[in-house]
Amino acid sequence: YFDTVDLEEHRKSDAGELAKDKVRIRWYGDELDPHRLEAGGSSSVGVPGERSVEVWLERKSRRAFASTKQRLAVEAPASALTFTALEEGIVPAALLVDTMARFGLFPPGGRFCPVIAISYARCRFTEPVTGFRVSLDWRIRSSIVKPGLALGERGLVLPGAVVEIKGPAFHMPPALRPLADIGSSWTRYSKYSSSLDAHASARGSVSRAWPSGVMERAPGPIGWVSRTEQNGE
């Protein structure tokens, strides 16, 4: 995930503002783990003959209840996706800025800063009558990429799982209404901001890695239902 130097989009998300954007580079698969250190703790990016990986430059925009996603597929060297290389931004900074400009987003100061890497496992489901989509995300991990931010931790784990529902109407179809019985409330949720908030909390806090305001009394899976979308990123 990328942001301004002063984390303006994170601030907007935490404040619940109706107009906000997320800039990220996404890729898929278990092989390229963004939290893993290479042997020796360093990596060389763009070695001649190195294999390339398809990644997606994405802008996700939310305006009140409406959200849109724009993305462009490009090739990046596999070594650019290792933890020690992520602060360089994966792709040339000019390519990211130019792509976001084509999408209608212009960063203050003319640059985006790599901030945090987030990965997760996901299962997708589709309600066949209405086309509502349900995703279940778990094993959510995050690593700080921006130097000097929070404690700079790597591989911080969010317990439990996130359930997200996306569809053409605000009310869920009858087939999905039993999801309300998982014991959670409907709310907006951002993996980006929730992970940054967890990294900013003190080590040892009881509910540090849980989504804000949600914690179970006993160990076990947590149900978190949201209409937002937000697996290496």
Language model features: what each stretch is:
Residues 1-233:
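Phosphate-end processing signature that detects enzymes handling 5′-triphosphorylated RNA
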